[in-house]
Each structure stands twice: as structure tokens, then as C-alpha cells.
Regions:
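Intrinsically disordered, low-complexity terminal regions
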Residues: 1-180
Length: 180
């Protein structure tokens, strides 16, 4: 009887460990994808937004030469690019199921709509402004090896950098605070 109980406990422990790996650890492993090298383009309508949040190694270009969003990426990555407006911020990233991309190219060109007042880049992403961005109050945040390059005219601005990130900016403002 004791042997049966011990076997039942061991089976339950193995099932619990398997369930843990399937539910918790497996999503952390994600997909590993290598860019194909064949760049394709997709155009989507631009939603209303006043800020840009880039993450997961995507490059965002702010241009006054486009009115829609243009996504350029390797043909095997283009369907994994996520561009959406959430609470007024334009999120540009990759699908969460992708864990690692090798030799991948993802460039998202967004319109300089005259409303942009914040730039936030993280996780090796880049934001490049091709035109001067104007706002009353402007915020720039870069973290985790991200890069932001922009020209800003504002009454006030804040710039925050951390974790090997870089901000290269031309700022014209009455006041500007920097936290690096």
C-alpha cells in the first residue's frame, strides 16, 4: 500500500513539473527566426497617436513624407510585426512569441502627424526623426540598448536614458531635464 501511495505521489509530482514547463517556461523560450534577406513592404492606415513606443529591435522612422504606416521587413518576419495604437501611443514591436531574431530587418515608417509629444524606445530598438517634432511638453525615454535620434522644439522636455541606451537630440526648449 505504501509503495502504491509513493508511486502515485511521484506521478503527481512529474505531472506537476510537466505542467509547469508547458505553462511557464515554454513561452519564455519562444521562437528563433533568421531573417530571409528578402525585404517586402506592407502599408497600413495610421491611427491617431501622440506618442511612439518602439521595442524588440524594430526601427521606427518618423517622416513627413508619408501619411500611412509603411512596414518593411524580411518576408518571413512581416506578419510578426505589430503596429497598433494603445491609449494614444503607437506601439511598434514584434509578436511576443518571437524570442530571438538573427539578421532580421524591420523598419516602420510613420507619419509626423504634428501631434507627437513622446518617444519611448527599448530593447535594442531605434527611433529616428527625419523632421523636427514640436510640442508644448515633450518626453524622450530610451532603455536597454535602444537609440533615439530626433530634433525637438518644445516649451519643456524630459529625457531619460538607462542600460546602454543612447539619445542623440537637438532640443530647443525653455526647460529640459535629463536623467541618465
Amino acid at each position: 500500500m505504501k509503495k502504491l501511495l509513493l508511486i502515485a505521489v511521484l506521478i503527481a509530482a512529474c505531472l506537476s513539473a510537466t505542467a509547469y514547463v508547458a505553462c511557464v517556461a515554454a513561452p519564455l523560450l519562444g521562437k528563433n527566426i533568421k531573417g530571409s534577406g528578402k525585404i517586402v513592404t506592407k502599408t497600413v492606415p495610421a491611427p491617431d497617436f501622440d506618442g511612439i513606443e518602439a521595442s524588440r529591435a524594430v526601427k521606427v522612422v518618423i517622416s513627413d513624407k508619408v501619411s500611412d504606416i509603411r512596414i518593411e521587413a524580411d518576408d518571413n518576419l512581416i506578419d510578426l510585426v505589430v503596429v497598433r495604437a494603445v491609449k494614444g501611443k503607437l506601439e511598434a514591436t514584434l509578436d511576443q512569441e518571437v524570442n530571438n531574431i538573427q539578421n532580421g530587418n524591420v523598419t516602420i515608417t510613420v507619419p509626423a502627424n504634428g501631434k507627437i509629444r513622446s518617444l519611448d524606445a527599448s530593447s535594442a530598438s531605434k527611433i529616428i526623426g527625419e523632421t523636427t517634432l514640436k510640442a508644448g511638453k515633450f518626453s524622450i525615454e530610451a532603455s536597454s540598448a535602444a537609440k533615439i535620434k530626433a530634433a525637438v522644439e518644445a516649451v519643456s522636455c524630459t529625457i531619460e536614458t538607462s542600460s546602454a541606451s543612447k539619445v542623440e537630440a537637438s532640443i530647443e526648449a525653455e526647460s529640459c531635464s535629463l536623467d541618465a
